[in-house]
Amino acid sequence: MFPSECLPSRRNFLKTTAALTTGLSRLTILSQPALSEDTWLTIVGPKKGYSAEIGTLTSMMAFMRDQVLRSVKTLSQQDLDFLLDAKANTIGALLVHLAAIESFFQMNTFEGKSGDKLPEAFKEKWGMPMELGEPARKSIKGNNLDHYLNVLQETREKTLAEFRKRDDAWLMAVDKDWPWGPTNNYCKWFHVTEHEANHNGQIKFLKSRLPGAKPSNE
């Protein structure tokens, strides 16, 4: 199912179509200042400041991150700490988990660190949210939404800064020792995006189970 907050509903689409036939939408469009397509989340492709393929990758990452932010934008601290059952993860913990996984791939692809050679400082900061489970259930709580958004933003800013230093040859470089088999940096960072998409689905499910949650069409 398409994200309902990203794409128009059938009813809204029909309304828009009717407006177009009368020329009203054209007048509205003409009255708006022009926007650069480079800033549109719905344009996947090269972006200024990056090599062609890295820019395309960042556009996919930005679209997915926007979907996550849409999912959590109205959540209170109580919502973020909500535990569905004794083995579930909270939404707050999942948000830190996203940052932890991205930080791991920073260490791996930017600094050449494998999973068994991570610095102790990294393990202390990110080990628990990477693994989740009982330690995360006990420790990752009591924070408002801004706390989690700042963690995500700081991590993403580092990723983008490092991407700007690199080219498509780096993106295509193959790690022959990766556990999945020969894997290039492009695949690793696409996995970061895919991983975020999976957890966004989990976040939406948990939202639907919050006390007092209204039925959703997502």
Which role fits each region the language model picked out?
Residues 73-78:
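Extracellular-facing binding/remodeling surfaces
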Residues 51-58, 80-82, 91, 139-147:
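Second-shell loop/turn segments in exported
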Residues 8-9, 18, 38-47, 58-69, ...:
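Short, contiguous alpha-helical
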Residues 1-8:
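N-terminal secretory signal peptides
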Residues 128-172, 188-192:
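Acidic/histidine-rich alpha-helical segments that form the ligand environment
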